[in-house]
Amino acid sequence: MANRGARHARTEDTENTINYVQCDGLAVMKMVKHCHEESSNMDLAQGALLGLVVDKCLEITNCFPFPKSGDETMDDETYQLTVMRHLRRVNVDHLHVGWYQSSDVGNSLSLALLESQYHYQTSIEESVVVVYDTQKSSRGFLCLKAYRLTPQAIQMYKDSDFTPEAFRTLKVGYESLFAEIPIVIKNSPLTNIMMSELNELLPEDKGHNFLDLGTASVLENHMRSLIERVDELYQESVRYNKYQQVVFKQDTEKHRALAKLAAENAVRTSKGEPTVPEEEVIKQFRPMPVPARLTATITSGQINTHAQHIAQFCSQSLAKLFITEALQNAKETKEIK
């Protein structure tokens, strides 16, 4: 889990003090390289973010990957402390300001992400989680987003109360679990000059595939993931409906038993006998534990994210399709003439 190595020293409450995240180009390239290397092995890439807070800006100046979970020869916390100690010796920012992880098929919201960010944010108040979408970035759209847990989500997780009543009281939904923080990438002037020169050296037939309609695999992956999430949400709904049916049946039996007891007590009273207290009947019906709704909330958020990505992707593909059709018709008309 990404909460490995999170420090346990609380600082002052700094909620809503991080207005934006500034990430150096070097840190971005290291994150991108690590995430793409792990995506080839179908693994989830995770790592630590290093930097500092300046005014209301969180500056990320460096990062390093976490060791793989299957590596039993390396202690995670010792590894992180050793890396930060070496960085400090060479005068590199070594303050732990968050963590990053890769995301596939454009969906990063999960129970593990929520739990890890909770541990980070309650021990390092200014920490953020940076999510890099490998699939979308491989199509030419750099997708790098920073998130923080909202105060309501932190309070709910702190109370460990994920019942429907808690969600209503705190007004928490899948759209209010995380707050997205604007992220900007900063490069040195020399880096910008080099990138401009590289752009001029790029062949004309490369890097301008704006009308590429490669929709099959992307749309298929999104649809498959959407169907899986809908099935999971259906199973959660079935479990909750069964709970409601059991509660309704129990309440009916309890009211029937109380009515019977009231009739018996009326007979006892008429005979001058002591009545039986209602608590004797109520004790026979133990309250059913309310199922947690956190998993269903996260699944709903995943469904919403997939639906948004599908709608956005389809609108872009349709626009490309109509443009391509117009160009093809113009080409055929020109050939006829």
From Swiss-Prot:
Keywords annotated in UniProt: Cytoplasm, Initiation factor, Protein biosynthesis
Compartments, record wording: Cytoplasm
GO molecular function, one term: translation initiation factor activity
InterPro entries attached to this UniProt entry: eIF3h, eIF3h_C, JAMM/MPN+_dom, JAMM_MPN+_peptidase_M67A, MPN
GO annotation, cellular component aspect: eukaryotic 43S preinitiation complex; eukaryotic 48S preinitiation complex; eukaryotic translation initiation factor 3 complex
Main location: cytoplasm
PANTHER family, per database record: EUKARYOTIC TRANSLATION INITIATION FACTOR 3 -RELATED
Summary of the function given for this chain in its UniProt record: Component of the eukaryotic translation initiation factor 3 (eIF-3) complex, which is involved in protein synthesis of a specialized repertoire of mRNAs and, together with other initiation factors, stimulates binding of mRNA and methionyl-tRNAi to the 40S ribosome. The eIF-3 complex specifically targets and initiates translation of a subset of mRNAs involved in cell proliferation.
Protein name: Eukaryotic translation initiation factor 3 subunit H
Species classification: Eukaryota, Metazoa, Ecdysozoa, Arthropoda, Hexapoda
